Curated annotation (Swiss-Prot):
Residues 679-690 have a biased composition (Low complexity). One of its GO terms (molecular function) is initiator methionyl aminopeptidase activity. Gene3D superfamilies: 3.30.2010.30, Neutral Protease Domain 2, Peptidase M1, leukotriene A4 hydrolase/aminopeptidase C-terminal domain, tricorn interacting facor f3 domain. The gene is RNPEPL1. Optimum pH is 6.6-8.0. It is an enzyme of class 3 (hydrolase). The active site is at residue 354. It catalyses: Release of N-terminal amino acids, preferentially methionine, from peptides and arylamides. Zn(2+) binds at residues 353, 357, 376. It comes from Homo sapiens. This is Aminopeptidase RNPEPL1.
Amino acid sequence: MAAQCCCRQAPGAEAAPVRPPPEPPPALDVASASSAQLFRLRHLQLGLELRPEARELAGCLVLELCALRPAPRALVLDAHPALRLHSAAFRRAPAAAAETPCAFAFSAPGPGPAPPPPLPAFPEAPGSEPACCPLAFRVDPFTDYGSSLTVTLPPELQAHQPFQVILRYTSTDAPAIWWLDPELTYGCAKPFVFTQGHSVCNRSFFPCFDTPAVKCTYSAVVKAPSGVQVLMSATRSAYMEEEGVFHFHMEHPVPAYLVALVAGDLKPADIGPRSRVWAEPCLLPTATSKLSGAVEQWLSAAERLYGPYMWGRYDIVFLPPSFPIVAMENPCLTFIISSILESDEFLVIDVIHEVAHSWFGNAVTNATWEEMWLSEGLATYAQRRITTETYGAAFTCLETAFRLDALHRQMKLLGEDSPVSKLQVKLEPGVNPSHLMNLFTYEKGYCFVYYLSQLCGDPQRFDDFLRAYVEKYKFTSVVAQDLLDSFLSFFPELKEQSVDCRAGLEFERWLNATGPPLAEPDLSQGSSLTRPVEALFQLWTAEPLDQAAASASAIDISKWRTFQTALFLDRLLDGSPLPQEVVMSLSKCYSSLLDSMNAEIRIRWLQIVVRNDYYPDLHRVRRFLESQMSRMYTIPLYEDLCTGALKSFALEVFYQTQGRLHPNLRRAIQQILSQGLGSSTEPASEPSTELGKAEADTDSDAQALLLGDEAPSSAISLRDVNVSA
C-alpha cells in the first residue's frame, strides 16, 4: 500500500500531552439542543464521501462516549434539516483502553440511484467483537438554524461505561458545506468544496454537540473524486494512493466548529520550517511570495510571548472568493479568502490574528457564544503584541486607530444602548449566535484586555500572565470568570487593591454595560502615521475649497501605508454626503490613483462615489463589481447602491454578473435588491448612460426575476452563515 504522508507534526517536536476534558459538565448553551451535559465525548470518527456532481456529502459518524450518570434514556445531538439520517446503531466499547480507529467501506460509483453512506469496519479484537445493534431515532425542530436528533439508548448503560453510537447520513444544501462549480474557482478546472462551521453551522456537516463547551479529538477518512486534493484541520494527514482515500487525525481536543474540510485543485508550497501554503496553481506563486518566511517570524514572536505553539504545523489554504468571511482559524490549517492577497497590510493583520487564535480561541476556548470576546478580544490583543514585536508600535497604533474608528462608526449606527455592544451578550433561545459577531466582540474586548495589561503596569508581566493562563486552561473551554480569577490570582497585589471594583471601571461594568469601551489605549506612538491622515482630512473640509484642494493635492498619498489611506477614506465616508464640488475635486485629485490601488482602498473610494451619487465615476463601480465575486467586496456596495438613488444601476450590474456569483452570495444580493421594490427607483438627478436599460424595467419585472427561480431556499438561510471578518 503506497502512502504519501503529509504529517502536520513539526519536525523534531514532541506532541504536547493531551489533557482530559474537565469532569464537571460543560456550560449550558442555549444555542445547542444537545444533551452534552449528560455525556463525556472522548473521540469522534468520520467517514466522508464527497459527491460534487450531486452537491452531496455522504457520511458515517462514530461517536465514542460515556454517560456521566447511569441509565441515560437518550442521546440528543445537534443536527439540521439538510441532514438525512439513514441509520443509528449502538456498539459497546472494547475492553482495550485504546482501539485502532475503524475503517470505512465506500460504495463503488455506478449508474442508478446514489450509493448509501459509508459503512464502518471495526478492527477485530481478541475474543468476541462487540456487536452493533440498531437504535431508534427521531428528528425534531429546534431553531431556524438547526434541529435536534434524539437517539434512544439501551436501558442498561452504566455511568462512565464507554460506548459508541454510529450514525450514517447524507447532507445536501447544508449551510456549513459550500460547493463550487469549476467556473467559480480561479483555475476553472475542478469542482471545489469547503466547510465553514463557525458559529453553529457544523451541525449540518455532521450530528454533534455543537457547542464550544465540548471538545474532543477526531479522526477522518475522506474519499474524493480523482485528482482532488483534500485537507482538514488535523495534526496528521496522509493519502493512501491504492485506496484513493485521505486519512486525518486531530490529536488535541477541539470544539465541533473547528472541524473543517476543503477539497479542490490545490497545490502546496513550503514557506517555512513548519508552514506551507495551499492554493490553486495560478495563485500559488503570489501566495508564496507574500508569505515566505513571514509566518515563521510571526509564530516565533507569538511563542516568545505566550509559550510553545502546540498544534505542530501552521498551514494556510487560500479559498476562492465565495468564502463567506475573511479568514477562519481552523487549527493547523487557517482558511483565508484569496481576495485579500492584493492587500498586503490587511493580509498581514488577518494572518497574524489567526496565528494568535492558536493560543486564544483554539487552545483556550470561550465556553459559550455569549462570551465570544474571550477568544476574539484576547486574540486581537495578542495580534497587536505580535505586530508590535515585528513591525513596531507605530504600525500597531495605526491599525488600532483604524479599527477603533470603525468601532465608533458602528456605535453611532446601533446606538449606545444597543445590547450587542455588551461583552457578555445575553443569547436568547432561537437567536443565531452568529448575529452576536460584531466589532464590539473584537475591539471592546481588546480594550478590556488592554486595560487589564495596564493595571499590572508592564506589558511583559501581562504576557507572562497570559502564558500561564494558556498553560492552565489549554484544550479546555472557559468562562470570563476563569480569566478574571486567574488574573487576580497572578497579581495578588492588584486583588488587594480591589482593582475589579474601581468606580466607573468595575470588571462587571466592562462585561455588562452597553456603549463604547470604558477606556481606550494610548495611541500616541502612532501619531507619526495618523497625524498626516487627520491633517489631510481637515484640508478637504476647510474653506475656501480651491485653496484647500490645492494644498491637499500637494500631499502624495501614494507613499502612505494602506491603513493610512483606508483611514482617510473612512473619514470621508463618515462625512458623506459631501458637497458635490468637494466630491468633484476629490475625484479629480485621487480617482485615477486610487483605481490602481488594492481592493480595500478601491471599495472605500467607490462607496464615497455611490453615497454621493457621483455619476462620472460610476463606470469604476461597474468595473469593480464585474471583477469581484467576494461577499466582502460586493455586499457593501450593493447596500449603498440600494439605499440611495442608484438602485436601477445596481439591478443592471447584478443581472450582468450574477452568473459568476456563488448561489449563497447571489441570494444575499437578491434580498438587498428586492427590499423596497415598488418605490421609485428614479435617480435624484438626470441619469447618465451608465443606468442603461434597467431604467426602463418595471418594478414587477425586477421583482419577478429577483424572487423567482433564484428565491432564497429554505434549506440555506443566510443567517446560518457567519459573515463577520
